[in-house]
Amino acid sequence: MVMLWALISCAEISAQEIQKVSNDSIALQEVVVKAARVVNKEDGKLIFPSDIQKQRSFSGFSLLGKLALPHIRVDEAGRSISATDNKGEVQIRINGILANMHDVQMLDVASIMSVDYIDSPGVRYGKNIAYVIDIHTRRASSGGSLGFNLTNALTTKLGSNDVYASVNRGKSQLNILYEQTYVDNKASEYNEDAQYLLHDGSEYQISRKIMNGATQNYGNTLQLKYNLADSALYVFQTTLTTDFCNQPYTSNEMWFSESGKPAYPVYRTSKGRDFTPALDLYFYHQLGKHQSLSADVLGTYIHTKGAYYEGEGEPYQYQVDGKTYSLIAEAIYENRLKPFTFSAGTNLNWKYMDNQYLGDVVSENGIRSLGIYGFAQIKGSLGQFKEGTSRLTYVAGFGLSNQSYRQGDEEFSFWLCRPKLTLAYSLTSSFQIRLGSELSQHISQIAMISDTRIRKNSMEWTVGNPSLKPNSIYENWVVFSFSKPRINTDFTLNYRINRHCNLAKYTRTENDQFLYSQTNQPHCNMLYLTNDTRFDIIPDHLILSVNAGIYRFFNKGDEYSHCYTAYNYSGTLQGYWGKWTVMLYADNGWNFMEGENIGHNPPSLATSASYHIGDFDFTLYMHNPFMAHPKSYSAEIVNALLRKQVRGYDNSGGNLLRIGVAWNINRGKEYRKIQRNINNEERETGILK
């Protein structure tokens, strides 16, 4: 350790004039950043991508992957961003406003100034948000762009293809995007060994095995966006998005065997489709030099149809026709005072779900929910180093929320206070200690509070619980950060307490049916220590990023107590030579325990090579090389009544080879800075499966 710190201390630091200009951003004053620059903040990091990183990136996914953000996994080929520690969702924003994966894909990388990585979101952010990535860009005031991005597998039927265009004129900007995705997989496997403890004390064993599972899925998205902005005064944006997804079939021939009897085939099938139009209206107005007001309204309609058949034991089938209507409205006021920035706001989330089940399930499931949330927050700093960075920074906020549900005769209302405090103290301009404490709310999936009962197989049922209540989460953490031009490292110690949380509950009926539901139980706590390190082995040419963590889980249910320790790690190596970009990624999966369920995500190995020429970018992706039958997931249930071992395999994911071809032209663009502040999205249908 002494030698490591000696090595770090020898690295040179080039001071840059940095001025804190607002609550959420730090801007460089006429400085050209030639290497990735990281500024530690009270709630995360502000990162300035290097010129070479932007030149070698053809989309927002590509650039974010090169930044190697802690606890973040960027799948450029699959166009997804997720948290490696499963703490919650990753929220993506562009200039402060919520962005979806389509916005990230068509982002003009040349316009990006900085990336604000927030690993401790304040009270102004929504529920279940673990990380926020806010990409700051300059706005084009003229010109336009046209492009496409085609990514398709050569070894199986899997792909994602989009085409987009953007036109800028004066204060107006118009964007259009169309994306088409498809999956046609006929090579999945599933193995399950279950042991059921019957009423008479005997053990009943069942083996379920699927050899050639087949799934088809097709998706289409059309997005239109219009933006009118005067960056010094106002922003108005309207976005219309329509998603249509079709799953013609999922068909599985399963070999079923029970205690002392030969195996025989049974069948499971399903199909479905959904249609989701959404309209988002956003407005931001600057009130003088220091104050601003922003508002956002999102309306969403989701229509879902599905049919399911399960042939184990007595044939069981049902259909569902679901309609979901939702409205999310939010307003935020901000005042940038000299000692600190004050912000306050309110959020309203209304939803009505009407899911009608037919066939062997007869249940008209109408659920109304209403969430109201208000908050106030201050954010500031005390003292500065000579290069302009703050010595002590703080964020203090308080939120108050009410969540109410009504379903038939069942209804409840839940109030929760949400205080949060984060303090960051910099011993030097390179070394920072950050402390935080927060009380937040967790709400179970709405499907689990329905009054519906669905058969899973001949022995098991999934049962909704209308009396299920939200629970509070109490979290404390300390982060030690060290930053130099060539190395950045964070040590994080975190303890999360989930009291009266929603955990799985297994019960047995008199006729030996096993019911899975969720109930509020004592606690599910987690303690972990992690390290995230990024090292520029050869600046601008070879970069290594590693993550390693020890996780300890403490589960206390009504009838059990379980502890579990997991070791999770990952690493990324990126190289840039001429017009080539090469990436190698590996991890040991994510291992965890929640209640009486132990989950094992399998190890992952991926590599890619990109070649950039003119307006084109060609990329070859390889996932799970030298693996013919890679495991896609595994899990264990360690309940006293039901013990189960599950393993899934995706043969099409072994030696998976994908090729990407991207083309983009930008003509006549001139840029200016823009700022926005709000985020919203709605996807939940409340359908129990």
Feature-to-residue mapping (PLM):
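Short, acidic, small-residue-rich periplasmic hinge/interaction motif at the N-terminus
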Residues: 17-53, 77-78
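N-terminal periplasmic accessory domains that precede
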Residues: 20, 30, 60-65, 79-82, ...
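Periplasmic plug
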Residues: 73-120
